Amino acid sequence: QECKCHVSGSCTLRTCWRALSDFRRTGDYLRRRMNGAVQVMATQDGANFTSARQGYRRATRTDLVYFDNSPDYCVLDKAAGSLGTAGRVCSKTSKGTDGCEIMCCGRGYDTTRVTRVTQCECKFHWCC
């Protein structure tokens, strides 16, 4: 909920409205929930589901659940529509998904130094 004071500035009268939470906060919350998701499989009658792994906790009503593991996007998988990451350009300094540590999936990577010479369209102006 967000509120704003009226013109007087004394906040004796405010207008409030419902608003979406910050996008980063929502994403962080979903990431935490996803990391705790429980893999399940359908029961024999198909009316319910149970934990897919013996000895793991049962899913609660508020847990995120999933049936199938995610595909391995590191390798070519035409059925999943993944071209893999081999041969792609990565950023050695980035810690994000474009960084070599993540994109190369532990396979290692080669570095190449590229030097580009370009015309800068610079002009010299005598000033003093």
Curated annotation (Swiss-Prot):
One of its GO terms (cellular component) is extracellular space. Its main location: secreted. Glycans are attached at N48. Keywords: Developmental protein, Disulfide bond, Extracellular matrix, Glycoprotein, Lipoprotein, Secreted, Wnt signaling pathway. The keyword Repeat does not apply. One of its GO terms (biological process) is cell fate commitment. It holds the Pfam family wnt. One of its GO terms (molecular function) is cytokine activity. This is Protein Wnt-2b-B. It comes from Xenopus laevis (African clawed frog). The gene is wnt2b-b.
